[in-house]
Amino acid sequence: MTIINKTAQTLFLTELVKGMSLTLDYFFRKKVTLNYPFEKGPLSPRFRGEHALRRYQTGEERCIACKLCEAICPAQAITIESEPRIDGSRRTTRYDIDMTKCIYCGFCQEACPVDAIVEGPNFEFATETHEELLYDKEKLLQNGDRWETEIAANLANEALYR
């Protein structure tokens, strides 16, 4: 760069003018910042949030106690106990997930042959105590009942890829 060019850039502050023009350009664009608890951004249909156990339309729980989710969980966060019913089918008597161990990988959801355990759209489940993050079967079924419409819609959208 010649001395004349350097002097011209310094004298006319071309770098400063370029920076200010960029700032003005962004100043008049649409804002992308959200005012988070009052505004919420879109979630991907593949978002993996709080776990839930689903039920059939009849109200019967879907889980058949195959224990595939427990076996595949890399964090060993799932504990299942089951017993056979009179009709020969198996159902869970205990289904616990330690959410402090869970790494939200989604392997349990992928392994489940009947779509019983899913990771729902809820990401706001902060608690004050550790015990509140130890989910039992009842808590998981409540989550499933609460988020069933969104979970079913997300699973239907992803059916081609499963």
UniProtKB/Swiss-Prot annotation:
[4Fe-4S] cluster 1 binds at residues 63, 66, 69, 112. Gene3D superfamilies: 3.30.70.3270. One of its GO terms (molecular function) is NADH dehydrogenase (ubiquinone) activity. Disulfide bonds: none annotated. The keyword Translocase applies. This is NADH-ubiquinone oxidoreductase subunit 8. It comes from Reclinomonas americana. Belongs to the complex I 23 kDa subunit family.
